[in-house]
């Protein structure tokens, strides 16, 4: 019985201490979730890991489009020639990211175009990875979580934190939606 294993690498990037994930299978087929790498050093650290592990990235999957989660999208898209996937309700948030970048002091941020819009409960299959897209709005209008059912792993973006829940004091956030998503 061959039982494939998935591997998960977490990076903490940018002044917001955002978590970026690389998830890949034994054959090296993988995805990057929420690339927040902004500085040259962060991008070099990311590239070094991908190269050392010989990972073939196939897609960028974003839980949402707040500035801390999108700072590295343009870099990753251009470096690895892979598509960006995002929920359609995040479009206004992504469109506002250039303004947010200026407000928060990221002058070199480049917004990236979305290549594929998520559908609710979509299953993304890449190599041995089967990733279910769960619509969990509240922290952001089109926030999604990624559920690796077989492994019982959820990557929830900013829905939950240790002993806390995601903030809802940003534009387009909704506390009631967040509570319903968590349930």
Question: What does each of the following model-derived ranges do?
Answer:
Residues 2-7, 102-106, 127-128:
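Short Pro/Gly-enriched beta-strand edge/turn motifs at strand-loop
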Residues 11, 23, 120-127:
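Short acidic-hydrophobic surface loop/beta-edge motif
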Residues 23, 63, 136:
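Conserved S/T- and glycine-rich ATP-binding loop of Class I adenylate-forming
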Residues 30, 60, 83, 135, ...:
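Hydrophobic "anchor" residues on beta-strands that sit immediately upstream
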Residues 37-43, 47-125:
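Active-site HxH/HxHxD metal-binding segment of metal-dependent hydrolases
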Residues 37-38, 100, 129-183:
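Metallo-beta-lactamase
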């Amino acid at each position: 019985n061959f039982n494939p294993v998935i591997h998960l690498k977490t990076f903490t990037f940018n002044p917001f201490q955002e978590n970026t994930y690389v998830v890949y299978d034994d054959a090296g087929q993988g995805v990057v979730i929420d690339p927040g790498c902004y500085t040259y050093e962060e991008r070099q650290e990311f590239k070094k890991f991908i190269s050392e592990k010989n990972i073939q990235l196939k897609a960028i999957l974003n839980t949402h489009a707040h500035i801390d989660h999108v700072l590295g999208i343009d870099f990753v898209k251009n470096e690895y020639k892979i598509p960006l996937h995002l929920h359609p309700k995040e479009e206004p948030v992504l469109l506002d990211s250039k303004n947010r970048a200026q407000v928060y002091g990221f002058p070199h941020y480049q917004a990236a175009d979305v290549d594929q819009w998520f559908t609710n409960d979509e299953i993304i299959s890449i190599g041995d990875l089967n990733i279910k897209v769960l619509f969990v709005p509240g922290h952001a209008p089109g926030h999604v979580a990624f559920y690796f059912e077989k492994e019982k792993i959820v990557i929830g973006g900013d829905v939950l934190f240790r002993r806390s829940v995601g903030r809802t004091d940003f534009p387009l956030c909704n506390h009631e939606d967040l509570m319903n998503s968590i349930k």
